[in-house]
């Protein structure tokens, strides 16, 4: 599988070890940078990862910055990206299996490398489990990528709120 991998200057060392891990698992890594510790800006590399994924050059993407918050916000601005910032296996699997996430984000200063690699491996090997409900939710998320009149409608999510009120969602 082809995995796009990007980071900011704070976690270049972490990214390099993740790259080595992915290669050891037989994956092709598309390293979009950064490549050293010179101060840079995470949105550049979040965007590059997202573009590799939505163009089809990469199957999935991994973004890492200090907390993961900034680069994950940046990659989610690329139309077609569904990225989740995760720190645990449960969140990563939910993102892939239920929301068909195609990018995963991490805080390299928040989570240890070994756990990060385990989560990435599980994310890559997990499969999206399409249901009618998941498809509708993903369609609503996708609809938000383009500003349009429907989003201004205060009833945009009513269908899902009504199901909540009827007790159809369970944790």
Curated annotation (Swiss-Prot):
One of its GO terms (molecular function) is galactose-6-phosphate isomerase activity. This is Galactose-6-phosphate isomerase subunit LacB. It catalyses: aldehydo-D-galactose 6-phosphate = keto-D-tagatose 6-phosphate. Pathway: Carbohydrate metabolism; D-galactose 6-phosphate degradation; D-tagatose 6-phosphate from D-galactose 6-phosphate: step 1/1. Its EC number is 5.3.1.26. InterPro entries: LacB (IPR004784), RpiB_LacA_LacB (IPR003500), RpiB_LacA_LacB_sf (IPR036569). One of its GO terms (biological process) is pentose-phosphate shunt, non-oxidative branch. It comes from Staphylococcus aureus (strain bovine RF122 / ET3-1). The gene is lacB.
């Amino acid at each position: 599988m082809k995995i796009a991998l990007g980071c900011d200057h704070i976690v270049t060392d972490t990214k390099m070890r993740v790259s080595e891990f992915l290669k050891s698992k037989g994956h092709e890594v598309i390293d979009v940078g950064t490549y050293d510790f010179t101060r840079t800006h995470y949105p550049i590399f979040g965007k590059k990862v997202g573009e590799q994924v939505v163009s089809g050059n990469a199957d999935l993407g991994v973004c890492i910055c200090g907390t993961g918050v900034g680069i994950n916000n940046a990659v989610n601005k690329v139309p077609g990206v569904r990225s989740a910032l995760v720190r645990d296996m449960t969140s990563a699997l939910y993102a892939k299996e239920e929301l068909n996430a195609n990018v995963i984000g991490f805080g390299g200063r928040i989570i240890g490398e070994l756990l990060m690699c385990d989560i990435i491996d599980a994310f890559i090997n997990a499969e999206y489990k399409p249901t009618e409900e998941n498809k509708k939710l993903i369609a609503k998320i996708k609809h938000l990528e383009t500003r349009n009149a429907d989003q201004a409608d205060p009833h945009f999510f009513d269908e899902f709120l009504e199901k909540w009120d009827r007790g159809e969602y369970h944790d």
